[in-house]
Amino acid sequence: VAGARGGGAGGGADAAAVLVGLNALYGAKLSMSELCALGAGIGADVPFALMGGTCRVQGVGDLLKALPPVPDCWFTVVMPDYGVSTPEAFAAYDTVGSSTHPDCEAQEKAIRAGDLDAVCAAAGNALEECSGAKDNEAIKTLPRAHGAVTALMTGSGAAVFGVFRDEAAARAAAAAAKRQWPQVYVAQPDRGGARVIR
């Protein structure tokens, strides 16, 4: 959704779609684990884009544990008029680190319990402090002003997303954001990964 250099795994999603499409086109009948192994060689976010849904991801993105669907919610995604280089964001993280350390155990427990507030309370992005995404705090005020449960930077940035309990609030935040930023989207969590649509 977020576009190039937005931190939304756009390149990984494209690669996953190509793998799934080729698997179907050529009748290769590769299993999901085989596709994920191929995808991990292409990019860290490709296995998740293949599997989709709600997962706990570890390693370099190659170790996935399927979880129950995240509680019902809506997202407003705001992409500023600049992007962030993923390699540069990780290099900065390797140099300066981060004081943000999301509580993955608490988040998994909250997902299993279906508790959106607890899911959001345990969420965080360790790359946010060092990504160089200069407008993050300003962008995050918009979803929060419209009742977002939380607002965070996507992946390595630069897009920011707000999590909402209902569509109306997400759309109100999006309408306000469109007055300032060029790309704004409203979305819901997807329950699956890359797939062939016939």
Protein language model features and the residues they cover:
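Conserved, helical-rich catalytic subdomain that frames metal- and/or nucleotide-binding sites
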Residues: 57-150, 165-171, 175-178, 182, ...
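Short hydrophobic/aromatic beta-strand micro-patches
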Residues: 161-163
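Glycine-rich beta-strand-to-loop/alpha-helix junction loops that act as flexible
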Residues: 3, 10, 154-158
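Phosphate-handling active-site elements
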Residues: 21-38, 166-179
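DPxDG-like acidic metal-binding loop motif
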Residues: 8-34, 48-52
